């Protein structure tokens, strides 16, 4: 049952990475867009 024990850890890690990466990329993208539009 090593797969059942490894799968939740991989899922939590995947959710944590995407949960931090997606808002960060969207935040940086919106800031760069605001800077570009102002100029």
Swiss-Prot record:
Residues where heme binds: 18
List the Pfam families hit by this protein, alphabetically.
Cytochrom_B559
**Would the keyword Membrane be found if you checked this record's keyword annotation?**
yes
Which subcellular locations apply to this protein?
Answer: Plastid, Chloroplast thylakoid membrane
- List the GO terms this entry assigns under cellular component, sorted alphabetically: chloroplast thylakoid membrane; photosystem II reaction center
The GO terms describing molecular function are:
electron transfer activity; heme binding; iron ion binding
For this UniProt record, the keywords arranged alphabetically read as follows: Chloroplast, Electron transport, Heme, Iron, Membrane, Metal-binding, Photosynthesis, Photosystem II, Plastid, Thylakoid, Transmembrane, Transmembrane helix, Transport
- Which family does the entry's similarity section mention? Belongs to the PsbE/PsbF family.
Q: Subunit composition?
A: Heterodimer of an alpha subunit and a beta subunit. PSII is composed of 1 copy each of membrane proteins PsbA, PsbB, PsbC, PsbD, PsbE, PsbF, PsbH, PsbI, PsbJ, PsbK, PsbL, PsbM, PsbT, PsbX, PsbY, PsbZ, Psb30/Ycf12, at least 3 peripheral proteins of the oxygen-evolving complex and a large number of cofactors. It forms dimeric complexes.
Q: HAMAP family, alphabetically?
A: PSII_PsbF
Protein's name in the database: Cytochrome b559 subunit beta
Species source reads Spinacia oleracea (Spinach)
Annotated gene? psbF
